């Protein structure tokens, strides 16, 4: 074998080894790229899912905030309307006929007599003359008319020693009725 044949054989062997190394490298590169693509797809999918979750959470928060704002506005409007109804009822009671006030005051005096027995009866400046008349006409011994007080109607009964005061004012009765019937009134007005 000549030197040229040895050189050709070595060259051929080197070329084959280089080709094998190149093919092995290409296979390795293809595997690394495939793994990188899989990992990249996994990361992209995870990011997309996270973005979708964050978007849904933000939308839910915004919807909840908007619903709360609407509910608050609705409740404020309902409260305003209920306050107007309360004021209208109180105005209507204040403006009732003298016969109504006389009957109401007579009934309240009977309640005061049953609860405290004797004492002083205070009333609004409008009702005080009627209270004085009822005290003189009725069977209310031990009760005297007191000074006028700032109430819409009704009476304030005070024991003789001043330790007990019972509020029979129209506003107090209206407040009791209002508190006990507020849910029903709200249901009727606002469904």
From Swiss-Prot:
One GO CC term on file: proton-transporting two-sector ATPase complex, catalytic domain
UniProt GO MF annotations: ATP binding; proton-transporting ATP synthase activity, rotational mechanism; proton-transporting ATPase activity, rotational mechanism
Sorted UniProt keywords: ATP synthesis, Cell membrane, Hydrogen ion transport, Ion transport, Membrane, Transport
Subcellular location: Cell membrane
Pfam families: vATP-synt_E
Record's bilayer topology term: Peripheral membrane protein
Coiled-coil ranges from the UniProt annotation: none
UniProt record, GO biological process: proton motive force-driven plasma membrane ATP synthesis
Record-linked Gene3D superfamilies: ATP synthase, E subunit, C-terminal (3.30.2320.30), F1F0 ATP synthase subunit B, membrane domain (1.20.5.620)
Disulfide bond entries: none
Function of the molecule: Component of the A-type ATP synthase that produces ATP from ADP in the presence of a proton gradient across the membrane.
UniProt family annotation: Belongs to the V-ATPase E subunit family.
The protein's name: A-type ATP synthase subunit E
Lineage of producing organism: Archaea, Methanobacteriati, Methanobacteriota, Stenosarchaea group, Methanomicrobia
Gene designation per UniProt: atpE
């Amino acid at each position: 074998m000549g030197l040229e044949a040895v050189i050709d054989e070595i060259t051929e062997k080197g070329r084959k080894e280089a080709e094998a190394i190149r093919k092995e490298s290409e296979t390795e590169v293809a595997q690394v790229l495939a793994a990188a693509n899989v990992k990249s797809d996994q990361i992209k999918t995870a990011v997309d899912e996270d973005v979708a979750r964050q978007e849904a959470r933000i939308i839910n928060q915004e919807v909840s905030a908007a619903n709360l704002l609407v509910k608050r506005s609705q409740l404020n409007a309902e409260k305003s309307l209920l306050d107007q109804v309360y004021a209208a009822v109180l105005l209507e009671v204040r403006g009732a006929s003298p016969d109504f006030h006389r009957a109401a005051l007579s009934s309240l005096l009977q309640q005061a007599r049953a609860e405290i027995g004797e004492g002083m009866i205070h009333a609004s400046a409008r009702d005080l003359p009627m209270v004085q008349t009822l005290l003189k006409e009725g069977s209310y011994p031990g009760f005297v008319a007191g000074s006028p007080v700032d109430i819409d109607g009704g009476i304030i009964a005070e024991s003789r020693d001043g330790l007990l005061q019972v509020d029979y004012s129209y506003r107090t009765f209206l407040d009791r009725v209002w508190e006990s019937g507020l849910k029903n009134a709200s249901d009727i007005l606002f469904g």
